[in-house]
Amino acid sequence: MAQQGKILKEQKYDRQLRLWGDHGQEALESAHVCLINATATGTEILKNLVLPGIGSFTIIDGNQVSGEDVGNNFFLQKCSIGKNRAQAAMEFLQELNSDVSGSFVEESPENLLDNDPSFFCRFTIVVATQLLESTLLRLADVLWNSQIPLLICRTYGLVGYMRIIIKEHPVIESHPDNALEDLRLDKPFPELREHFQSYDLDHMEKKDHSHTPWIVIIAKYLAQWYSETNGRIPKSYKEKEDFRELIRQGILKNENGAPEDEENFEEAIKNVNTALNTTQIPSSIEDIFNDDRCINITKQTPSFWILARALKEFVAKEGQGNLPVRGTIPDMIADSNKYIKLQNVYREKAKKDAAAVGNHVAKLLQSCGQAPESISEKELKLLCSNSAFLRVVRCRSLAEEYGLHTVNKDEIISSMDNPDNEIVLYLMLRAVDRFHKQHGRYPGVSNYQVEEDIGKLKSCLTGFLQEYGLSVMVKDDYVHEFCRYGAAEPHTVAAFLGGAAAQEVIKIITKQFVIFNNTYIYSGMSQTSATFQL
């Protein structure tokens, strides 16, 4: 029965399991997400978390469902009017996936912060939507000190805004686009060199010759190239073209002297550029090795930094300046026997390297007084196979962003070289928050107020820019546009932002793929978006 349930789950979540694997899905299913305010944006985010099977969610909202809510929120209906908004949204969202557990709290976030701020620290991540600036600052401070990730989301007219607040977010499985294969052709390890030497391309039957893996072909002709160039690897365009020609000359000829159709040699020629990449440690990994968290290991050091330190020790000793072998090779034209033999050479070396890193992990855990079982074999293997792609994201706190002396002026001013850069929308959002603080409402919420609010909003914008010492000019068109928005939350923009926000939440929970750092702005006017470090 349990096996049948597992098969059904694999079928249900088939596509996403291919993205983040069983361990990513397990992390998702054990997560508890808190949503503050069941707005259109908030329910769209939860929809995109409930469908892939988030473990549980809690909605905090003290408001009752209004006609306006029903008009712009797909997850609220006429029959919901007058009910608590958190409860109504929870009931509809739970219908999407029976595997997910939902709950609600009929209270405002302000009251919870006043009476029980630690309430927010029980969640895996908190997502806050459409909150006032003063409430956000209080919430962000509580979560920052408790090291709970916070994602702020906001839809304002045709503008979408997200801000991630997380002290430190290490990523082992960053899944980089277009990652190069780890073939070590420029620095073959002894077992690989021995394997290459077992091939003699000059004395092979035609069938064997045309089914030799292209990795072997490049390695054999690289040895020939070295003998003619004093061991210098082809680097320039001309050198690589000459090397391709050298391989091309190795294609067998028929009785008429015409080249045979050997696809494996064509594959080798096509892969020259990527196969001859230099084996080296990326600068981002060097930065991790030189980080204080990697150098100073204590009993409180998280597993990621123990693993990073063990990796550093391996590079200095067994790796002889290199990271562990990844242990994978791409598909290629070759007979099964030759391919499997080559694959096993890389796999065995990867296992050997992982075992060496594991020995360093064991010593480090013992030296700092942590339990030997605190780092699993699975974590160790994941680290070794992704050692070239490790990432650490550190976001600034909201207090730093809003501080007069810690605001990132350079990022804002340099971005405003283009007066229509998306950063102008951030400045306008800060201005409307200032407007709300002064007038107790957002500009243009009533049609008759739009014209009179233009001057007031412009005054708020000027005051904000002067207070923060931002010598930039904002076009009047943006002031007019934000007054016309009237703080509306169009469902089309909320739906787009909901998808983007859920993606970042999943990245944080699974610790896979790389989150943005730290602000994302979407413009529905120009259909563009940008990220900023604010």
From Swiss-Prot:
MF terms in GO: NEDD8 activating enzyme activity; protein heterodimerization activity; ubiquitin protein ligase binding
Regulation: Binding of TP53BP2 to the regulatory subunit NAE1 decreases neddylation activity.
Interaction with UBA3, as annotated region: 331-344
Residues with N6-acetyllysine modification: 6, 341
SUPFAM superfamilies: Activating enzymes of the ubiquitin-like proteins
Gene Ontology CC entries for this record: early endosome; glutamatergic synapse; plasma membrane; protein-containing complex
Example of a GO biological process term: regulation of postsynapse assembly
Keywords: Acetylation, Apoptosis, Cell cycle, Cell membrane, Membrane, Ubl conjugation, Ubl conjugation pathway
Stored Pfam families: ThiF (PF00899)
Gene3D superfamilies, per the entry: NAD(P)-binding Rossmann-like Domain (3.40.50.720)
Predominant localisation class: membrane
Processing after translation: Ubiquitinated by TRIP12, leading to its degradation by the proteasome.
Keyword Cell membrane part of the UniProt annotation: yes
Site (Interaction with UBA3): 211
Tissue specificity of this protein: Expressed throughout the brain. In hippocampus, strongly expressed in granule cells and in the pyramidal cell layer. Strongly expressed in the piriform cortex. In the cerebellum, expressed only in Purkinje cells.
UniProt protein name: NEDD8-activating enzyme E1 regulatory subunit
Source species of the chain: Rattus norvegicus
